[in-house]
């Protein structure tokens, strides 16, 4: 036998299909359960590409019924809820109280997903700016509110909403995740 042994076995490739489906369903449910408009386009794109990768990895490593999966779903919901425009002073005060923990949890998720530093920094900066604009709504005259023109009302008949859901379902949804 030679010093280099060969085998007919191909290297094992991890199959993430079930994890991708679970992550897509969790993300879809989290978006659907969030009251208010759909997130801005840059948030949706980040959620489809990078955040879903985080959910896939947590699901793959820990499983559907795990505490880690429950935490991943929780931080997803909190992130989405934190960017919903509100005129309620109570809701804004709650956001101020919850932001430090949310930002810490988002950074942990980004690290787990091994998101590129430039993408991470860009997302966190845009998220900070969005949170600041949401918190300033109370101080602005009603005719000078924050421009939320790139958000989409949560209406299942809206083709933009359907397009988002289509990206979260099926093969088209998998093209956004690089494993």
Question: PLM features: residue spans?
Answer:
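Extended, low-complexity, amphipathic alpha-helical coiled-coil/linker regions that act as scaffolds
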Residues: 1-179
